[in-house]
Amino acid sequence: MHQIQNYELEIHYAGALPALEVKNILYSKLSINSNVRPSQSPVERPIVPITEDKIYFLPDASMQQAKVYFLIDGEPYAVKDAVNYMAFNEYFGGGFSGLVMNEIREKRSMAYSAYGHFSRPPKQGQMTKFTGYVGTQSDKVLDAIDVYMSLLDSMPQYPETIENIRTILRQSVLSNKPTFRSKSQRLTANMMLGYKVDPAMLQVRDIQRLTFDNILSFYQSHVQGKPITVLIMGDPGLIDQKQLKAKYGKITKLSKSKLFSN
């Protein structure tokens, strides 16, 4: 606790009191040092890069449903690419209209739930990461992996969906307003990403210019051909590990006791 007090902190207040009065109250109630060290928050923790395709399996005989995750290293985040990230996420994993749900659940009934998207880091320049997921029956794991991997390797193209994607993104951006009490946090978060104006102003402009070729180019540079880590959790007695190994190579088994402490 003593070390924490030696670092700068950020306090957000929403209310009717004047700023100076709020400051005096905080200084009287909190142990705030005058000479503090600069904070490095949010800290970007080092991550082991994904350099080759790998499959990990965490056995759990109690699981009624198997869970399969797909991980791909992304690129350093830049706000100029914000709409491209949003558009790909919507096209590839955007709910029931996205490729993942449509190809895996609607067409083939292989999954209870499925998604795939790039996550945005809190600061510009930090790394993005793609996370895909399929929740399916244990006896359908291999088939579900086959379909998902084919989507990542050779994404189906439906250019006619672009107008609907533009409409969804435009509505999302324009309706994503901070509440009264969260305005200052939103402003700080936007500044951390590198924005100097309201992101919606830039994003609406880029959405209007968005074409399907933008989504395709993003996929080709951020997803296609990149090494993939697959993590499977499920009942080892119901998942055909021999067939999985024959098709995808070595499977590294994980242990709950080593991953999680009691």
Where are these regions (language model features)?
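Charge-rich, well-structured scaffold segments of protease-associated domains
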Residues: 1-39, 113-262
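Short, structured coil/loop segments at alpha-helix boundaries
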Residues: 78-81, 104-107, 193-196
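Alpha-helical scaffold segments in soluble metabolic enzymes
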Residues: 24-25, 87-90, 103, 147
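A structural supersecondary motif
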Residues: 69-73, 93-135
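Structural beta-strand/beta-sheet cores of well-ordered domains, especially the beta-sheet scaffolds
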Residues: 7-9, 54, 66-70, 81-83, ...
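His/Glu-based metal-binding/catalytic segments typifying zinc-dependent metallopeptidases
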Residues: 38-99, 258-262
